[in-house]
Amino acid sequence: MKIYKLQTPVNAILENIAADKSISHRFAIFSLLTQEENKAQNYLLAQDTLNTLEIIKNLGAKIEQKDSCVKIIPPKEILSPNCILDCGNSGTAMRLMIGFLAGISGFFVLSGDKYLNNRPMRRISKPLTQIGARIYGRNEANLAPLCIEGQNLKAFNYKSEISSAQVKTAMILSAFRANNVCAFSEISLSRNHSENMLKAMKAPIRVSNDGLSLEISPLKKPLKAQNIIIPNDPSSAFYFALAAIILPKSQIILKNILLNPTRIEAYKILQKMGAKLEMTITQNDFETIGEIRVESSKLNGIEVKDNIAWLIDEAPALAIAFALAKGKSSLINAKELRVKESDRIAVMVENLKLCGVEARELDDGFEIEGGCELKSSKIKSYGDHRIAMSFAILGLLCGIEIDDSDCIKTSFPNFIEILSNLGARIDY
């Protein structure tokens, strides 16, 4: 894909940002904990979340879909499928399904694409194995494909050494099948969509005031079925917020955006850098929803070291903001970036250098000198949708060619369409 420099300002109201990926995955998987029809409007129709629907279909669920309205009727009993459960590129789908299936009677095989099958799964498989799960795979069940033989699970008191909503949710799902009350805690607060959704479904889960500790009881009855409207994804919206900031005389209003406090940290970073950015809450249901208004702004350098789990998906796009800011910026305490869809630390630094930016790898982040003269270049996405979309936005300033841009479809299928509608010239 080649993106040409955009010569005109942008002034737009965007209501068609991709639906939230985290909530879409959870809606589909959590429907298996109910016994009645579940309904979601504005379900994300991207490769990752469509794969999740296919997985639960192979486990016995019936699915009706009309455009982005999805109805799921769960099976009376989870089937042991005669096929591999394909998670595609989604670490969320694989890790949550490991936790869900560990306590289900049956034999299950989870696999993904070449990128997912090289991402670490021991953070899930190890604690589950310790409570009786049988999980087999390469490198001591660290790499998919993974085989899961469902077992009766023991109660646990698990203290996670990493802040990960995927680990947390996998352990919650396994706790529902354990033989007694379970406890989970993490070192810092990760995304809390699972807790919010499960509480709305009347799950037997208690959350401490600081959100760091959970008490989960085994399920004694099916959970309440869901009927929700999924808000738009703040991580996907972030690319267009960034576009409004870096393009002269531009303004973008982003509508129906999820404003969960654990998902807007990157926007707060932009505000601290000097961005003219306002967030307004319009609705409070099981999640906080609102709009984001962004205008062209001059940015200043910044050091980012806190709440990293809350901006891990936006880090590549933040690196673009760093490159366009005045002065030096850095992101640290972000070693998790090395085990995402790509090694995002190495890949961002490599590609920024190709575009004329002074950038340096740190063990747990990167350091970027802003204000360098940009040059048009060809960059590699390494199959990482967030790398591809971040450099697509930079391409609006300097022109850019992106290798393997099809990965964008895993999370944001209409990204190119929106970019084109804003006036960008794209050879795709």
UniProtKB/Swiss-Prot annotation:
Enzyme nomenclature, EC number: 2.5.1.19
Origin superkingdom: Bacteria
Annotated gene: aroA
Active site: 313
Known catalytic reactions: 3-phosphoshikimate + phosphoenolpyruvate = 5-O-(1-carboxyvinyl)-3-phosphoshikimate + phosphate
GO molecular function terms listed in the Swiss-Prot or TrEMBL record: 3-phosphoshikimate 1-carboxyvinyltransferase activity
Name of the molecule in the record: 3-phosphoshikimate 1-carboxyvinyltransferase
UniProt cross-references to Pfam families, sorted A to Z: EPSP_synthase (PF00275)
NCBIfam families: aroA (TIGR01356)
Keyword terms, alphabetized: Amino-acid biosynthesis, Aromatic amino acid biosynthesis, Cytoplasm, Transferase
Binding-site residues for phosphoenolpyruvate, renumbered to this chain: 21, 91, 119, 166, 344, 386
